[in-house]
From Swiss-Prot:
GO terms for molecular function: identical protein binding. GO terms for cellular component: host cell endoplasmic reticulum-Golgi intermediate compartment; host cell Golgi apparatus; host cell Golgi membrane; membrane; virion membrane. Belongs to the betacoronaviruses E protein family. It holds the Pfam family CoV_E. It comes from Severe acute respiratory syndrome coronavirus. This is Envelope small membrane protein. One of its GO terms (biological process) is viral budding from Golgi membrane. It comes from the Viruses. Residues 1-16 are virion surface. CDD domains: SARS-CoV-2_E.
Length: 76
């Protein structure tokens, strides 16, 4: 049977291809993790804007109104 390349060259080519594929898989996994973290940060921002900030605003507004009118802190 005829061989176009030597065994050492064939092994080097196969190892290079496998190393390249491992690098591509590593990049895909890294990209997936970064995308998941970005989605998590986006969802946390939605929760912050829609729930936390209005609550803090209402709390501070009521506290300021109570302190300016001399009413005891019954509403807070």
């Amino acid at each position: 049977m005829y061989s176009f390349v030597s065994e050492e060259t064939g092994t080097l080519i196969v190892n290079s291809v496998l190393l390249f594929l491992a690098f591509v898989v590593f990049l895909l996994v890294t990209l997936a993790i970064l995308t998941a973290l970005r989605l998590c940060a986006y969802c946390c921002n939605i929760v912050n804007v829609s729930l936390v900030k209005p609550t803090v605003y209402v709390y501070s507004r009521v506290k300021n109104l109570n302190s300016s009118e001399g009413v005891p802190d019954l509403l807070v």
